[in-house]
Design a protein with these regions (language model features):
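Conserved catalytic segments around the Walker B and adjacent sensor/switch elements
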Residues: 24, 47-64
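Mid-core helix/loop region of P-loop NTP-binding domains shared across ATPases and GTPases
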Residues: 17, 54-56, 64-192, 201-218, ...
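Conserved C-terminal helix/linker of AAA+ ATPases
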Residues: 241-266
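Pre-Walker A adenine-sensing motif
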Residues: 3-16
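Terminal-proximal interaction/regulatory segments of ATP-powered molecular machines
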Residues: 289, 293-372
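Walker A/P-loop nucleotide-binding motif
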Residues: 16-39
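Short alpha-helical segments that sit at the start of domains
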Residues: 264-293
Length: 372
């Protein structure tokens, strides 16, 4: 976080007299990339406010409903200038409207694109039309020789492999300002987990020795050791299991069960964020694979089991074409594998383990509805 402060601090000293900064943040799953950038944004915006600098920090998760330049710019415009966001602009027009709004207001913008690699991989637009990297790193070309209202753009990704999908000209505009986030050590994980437990669990529901056990478990993983997301996922799943069993507190057995139901590449947090029909599509995939006992099943098979899952829950099923879109989305999220010739398979987990986790999440959602 100190490096981010150093990179952008001159803006606070000379607002309106600095050029746009492009920063890349890379790090493995659970290394704190998103949290660090988000926390920095809050502190930076707060510091600007104390200096009476009109700065707005926008943090966009590209995994949540962002599949194109249009969707991205509409989201940013809705946060910065909602009064003009609903008009029928194209993606290019929206970007220009955003910049003009910032110039005319006037105010400044610091934009963070989290999981930008996901957006680049899933973008529906043709490569020759350009992309977000091309657009956002060349804003200075709109008003040559002038300082920018967009203070900077922070691109967050797991690694630099997404650059292989960019044109050489786009890669060069990204520059060389890169922050690499290492994985956490056991002691660091323990401190983070304790802080989260104090917020998410009621007092006495989870003992310190269990927190320490989960921290050591995550730090000692053979794959991606020090994964904070994995550790938080274990605590979340442990809590869900304890809730489902109507237990008063989380025990080591709940943690062991949670560990047996966890797998690399898919987090319970990611699964819980899926909307109803995407979740049912995943349930249909697991049930089809379980029934046929084959490495792959067809989209047609998944759709049939998706329909049955809907009927069993008295939910109106969506169209076949819509489920195909959801399958593509699940594939890009790394939750399933969709092979054009072979079909659909589950990655990072056994079908049985995934089914158990999905059942736990469904039960948790039911309990939440009952409490409402």
């Amino acid at each position: 976080m100190r490096m981010l402060h150093d990179l952008f601090h001159d803006f606070l000293e000379k607002p309106g007299q600095t050029y746009q900064r492009i920063v890349q943040i890379f790090g493995p799953i659970g290394s704190g990339k998103s949290c660090t950038a988000y926390r920095f944004g809050i502190e930076f915006e707060k510091e600007a406010k104390t200096r009476k600098i009109p700065l707005e920090v926008v943090h966009v998760s590209c995994k949540v409903g962002i599949d194109s330049r249009y969707a991205l710019y509409q989201t940013v415009l809705q946060k910065v200038a909602p009064e003009i966001a609903s008009r029928g602009y194209s993606a290019n027009e929206m970007l220009r409207q955003l910049v003009n709004h910032l110039r005319n207001t006037p105010k400044y913008l610091l934009l963070t694109l989290d999981d930008v690699d996901y957006l680049i991989r899933t973008s529906k637009e043709k490569k020759e039309e350009g992309g977000v990297v091309f657009d956002l790193t060349r804003l200075n070309e709109m008003f040559l020789g002038e300082y920018q209202q967009v203070v900077g753009v922070i691109f967050i990704a797991r690694d630099s492999s997404f650059k292989k999908m960019l044109d050489p000209s786009e890669v060069s505009t990204l520059g060389n300002v890169v922050i690499k986030m290492p994985s956490y050590e056991s002691a660091q994980l323990k401190d983070i987990l304790k802080e989260r437990v104090d917020i998410a669990f009621r007092a006495g529901a989870l003992e310190d020795q269990i927190v320490e056990f989960v921290a050591e478990l995550s730090a000692g993983k053979s794959y991606n050791p020090g994964d904070c997301r994995f550790a938080l996922d274990i605590l979340l799943t442990s809590g869900l299991i304890a809730d489902a069993e109507l237990a008063d507190y989380v025990t080591i057995e709940h943690v062991r069960k949670a560990t047996s139901e966890s797998f690399d590449g898919i987090s319970t947090e990611d699964l819980m964020a899926l909307d109803e029909h995407v979740m049912l599509t995943l349930i249909g995939s697991a049930q089809a694979l379980s029934f046929y006992k084959t490495p792959y099943v067809s989209i047609k098979d998944v759709y049939e089991y998706y329909r049955m899952a809907c009927e069993g829950r008295e939910i109106q099923p969506l169209s076949y074409s819509k489920i195909k879109e959801y399958i593509k989305d699940l594939h890009f999220r790394g939750i399933i594998n969709h092979h054009p010739q072979k079909g659909i398979s589950i990655v990072g987990a056994s079908v049985e383990d995934l089914s158990r986790v999905l059942q736990t999440i469904e039960r948790s959602r039911e309990l939440d509805k009952e409490e409402e």
